[in-house]
Amino acid sequence: MWTETAHYILLFATAAIGLEALILSPTLWSKGSAVAIRLGYRGACFAASLLAFSFGILMSRYVANDFSVAVVFENFSSETSPYYALTACFASREGVFFVYILMLSAVSLLLFNAKDLSTYQERGRYLFFISALLFMLLVLMISTANPFARISDPPLEGLGLPPAWLRPYKTLKILASFSAYALLTATFAKTVSMYSKGW
């Protein structure tokens, strides 16, 4: 039940981000409006919270040893400590996608401020760039690496965490790398938005 709920929440978040990009698209050729920016920002906050909630449910499936979820079966076992739940998530392509999308969503909201992005057009373009990128990544993840794919006949035991992922600090290293990538992407979007007034 929880897995299906998280999957539908993920789909809803994807639709919300796509709608946000659609609402903000006029800022590419116009000066933008306060209403569109408010809607876009609130939509981004709402979608980020939905993504975080969905990811939290995915983590709970690792802790609960729910081997009906394909990624849990492939990278976890009942003998693996719950401490390695996040590490096991990183060991799968689905988890890598999800964590990067979640980090990009959070970092982009942290970098959004009216002091740097002084005009509605700049704010609108920044939010549009981020929402369009997130929408494309989410569609790609859901279509090629769905983290909530189910196994029709679930096994009693998972395959376990690959030995290479048991090394200490590997998770922290990947988290730091993803944070840097997300910060770089959001900063690039912000810079382009700030210096594209005449476009």
Regions found by a protein language model. Name each.
Residues M1-W199:
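Polytopic transmembrane helical bundles with strong interfacial aromatic enrichment
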